[in-house]
């Protein structure tokens, strides 16, 4: 059987976030995500279609992924008589006697002042705002969207709003850089590549960690390197590309372009008839890479764990061609933000609720600790939005 509980989810998230989470926010999420999910997919709720895995899981994938969920929710909102103003960013909170009573917004050449009994801030994070991202993260590649500028953080400046975990931004390993300069997760590709005998080496041509270890530990090891490269034979490379193209991250036409000798942009993807030729293109010491390959293959043949605790599922071919992709650490979702209470109200630095002001989604700080736990950011978007809407509905009904 499969046993789970809100209490277990809380402890798992606290452990994953290295106890840097705001426990009250984690408990709020764990205790309401079930009800929020039922509303999201239920016929008497939002009725958003989703993919069923057929096995116990904490994760959920809406049809059409995030865009599909947003499209369905927008259609439901408008069908219920709601008005959705796109390309109309809020610029300022309307505050009277310390209470938030509306927002000012601009869009389509028109200025709006919208008064309301309550305002929900759901403007996302600040990963794209260099002024808010701590310097230690800027050496990594940004992988978020351009709109994550932390607008709400500026909007609450005059309200003495409490901000928590503003020094934390989510980082993840297994990333490449796209031609646009943005980071891109490679999880769909690396899973198949590692099963076919792929491994990573650093700038010295040496393996440095168990590539199949958990993301946090792998990332700490990557931070010690100047660079790292995923080394693949033909089978591993085919598996990698299958995962990435099936996820519509890039096309095989892109790969052909990136592998050409006259391509000098991102990503750094190279091909060699032998490991030595591949290393020459990457300015890596061939003898070190060849030694790494031999040690890896010896463990694969004996089905024993290597120095880093990995038992290779398959050896790397001794015949070319061979391929390499430079791998990076990426950052995207911000983990800090507004401090809320269990009614989704934004708190001030005295831990008092700011009248009329609520928050949901990534603009809220403290859920994740210092690293994101799979599926919980989308889960929090749903749960916190559901909770905030219910809280505001109760206020409006009074």
Where are these regions (language model features)?
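Helical element adjacent to the flavin cofactor pocket in flavoenzyme catalytic cores
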Residues: 63-117, 153-159, 338-339
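Conserved N-terminal glycine-rich FAD pyrophosphate-binding loop of Rossmann-like flavoproteins
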Residues: 1-2, 184-185, 376
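Conserved N-terminal/central alpha/beta ligand/cofactor-binding core
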Residues: 1-83, 198-200, 204-207, 235-237, ...
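Short, small/polar residue-rich loop motifs at catalytic or cofactor-binding pockets
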Residues: 193-195, 332-334, 374
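An anion/pyrophosphate-binding glycine-rich loop and adjacent beta-alpha core
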Residues: 153-155, 162-284
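A glycine-rich dinucleotide-binding beta-alpha-beta segment and adjacent secondary-structure elements
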Residues: 92, 288-371
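Glycine-rich loop(s) and the adjacent beta-strand/alpha-helix scaffold that form part
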Residues: 107, 114-179, 378, 387
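Internal hydrophobic alpha-helix adjacent to the cofactor/substrate pocket in enzyme cavities
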Residues: 152-162, 285, 290, 380-398
């Amino acid at each position: 059987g499969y046993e789970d509980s809100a209490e277990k989810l809380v402890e798992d998230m606290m452990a994953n976030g290295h106890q840097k989470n705001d426990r009250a926010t984690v408990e709020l999420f764990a205790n309401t995500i079930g009800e929020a999910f039922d509303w999201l997919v239920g016929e008497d709720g939002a009725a958003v279609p989703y993919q069923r895995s057929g096995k116990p899981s904490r994760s959920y994938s809406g049809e059409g992924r995030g865009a599909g969920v947003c499209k369905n929710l927008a259609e439901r909102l408008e069908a219920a008589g709601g008005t959705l103003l796109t390309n109309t960013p809020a610029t300022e909170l309307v505050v009277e006697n310390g209470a938030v009573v509306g927002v000012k917004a601009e869009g389509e050449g028109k200025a709006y002042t919208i008064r309301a009994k309550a305002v929900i801030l759901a403007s996302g994070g600040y990963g794209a705002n260099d002024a808010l991202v701590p310097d230690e993260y800027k050496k990594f590649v940004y992988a978020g969207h351009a709109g994550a500028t932390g607008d709400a953080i500026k909007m609450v400046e005059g309200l003495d709003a409490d901000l928590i975990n503003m020094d934390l931004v989510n980082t993840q390993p297994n990333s490449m850089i796209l031609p646009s300069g943005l980071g891109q997760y490679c999880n769909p590709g690396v899973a198949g590549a590692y099963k076919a005998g792929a491994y990573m080496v650093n700038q010295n041509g040496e393996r440095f960690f168990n590539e199949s270890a958990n993301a946090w530990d792998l990332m700490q090891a990557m931070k010690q390197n100047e660079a790292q490269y995923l080394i693949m034979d033909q089978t591993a490379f085919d598996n990698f590309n299958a995962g990435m193209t099936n996820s519509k991250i890039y096309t095989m036409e892109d790969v052909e372009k990136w592998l050409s000798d006259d391509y000098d942009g991102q990503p750094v993807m190279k091909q060699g008839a032998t490991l030595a030729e591949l290393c020459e293109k990457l300015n890596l010491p061939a003898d070190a890479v060849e030694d790494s390959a031999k040690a890896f293959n010896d463990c694969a043949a004996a089905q024993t764990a290597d120095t880093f605790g990995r038992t290779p599922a398959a050896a790397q071919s001794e015949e070319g061609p061979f391929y390499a992709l430079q791998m990076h650490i990426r950052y995207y979702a911000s983990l800090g933000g507004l401090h809320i209470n269990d009614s989704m109200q934004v708190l001030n630095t005295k831990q008092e609720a700011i009248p009329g002001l609520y928050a949901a989604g990534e603009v809220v700080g403290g859920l994740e600790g210092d690293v994101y736990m799979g599926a919980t950011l989308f889960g929090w978007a749903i749960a916190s939005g559901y909770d905030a809407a219910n809280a505001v509905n109760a206020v409006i009904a009074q």
